[in-house]
Amino acid sequence: MGELSRENFYAKIATTPRAVQGFFETVIEHFNKRNDMHAHHTDTNGGDLRLALPAELARHHTIRNFSTLYWQSRNQEIFVRSYLTPEEMSVFGFAGVKIPRNINEPLNSEVRLGELDWRYRAQDFIRASEAAALKMMG
């Protein structure tokens, strides 16, 4: 979750389309302005972005991620996992949302954001992520 993870994340998206970089920048900027949730990076999948609640709001002993996302260059997609269920994600207009195959996955859904999503739907993703955080808070 340190500076190296952040650098790896930005190196991974350095050659992506500008709209992908803009999507991530919009999401990061939004959540880093808040004091009740934040964005952080890990080296998972070569560098990813995670949106989390601090421990005291998550009623947990450590931070809890309510969303994880990373760029898949081969598919030209942003792969997302969310605390929302597939049905709850569909309320925000996201199609093709599935239950994760890994039964030990703590997040409840996964979706691949294609070009129309990462070009035009950053705000919809932010709203869905805020709903996931509220759900996690109980």
Spans of features found by a protein language model:
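Charge-biased C-terminal accessory regions appended to nucleic-acid-, cytoskeletal NTPase
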Residues: 100-138
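Short, conserved beta-strand/beta-arch hydrophobic-aromatic motifs that form part
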Residues: 39-116
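Generic hydrophobic secondary-structure signal
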Residues: 27, 59, 78, 123-124, ...
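Charge-rich, low-complexity N-terminal segments
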Residues: 1-46, 138
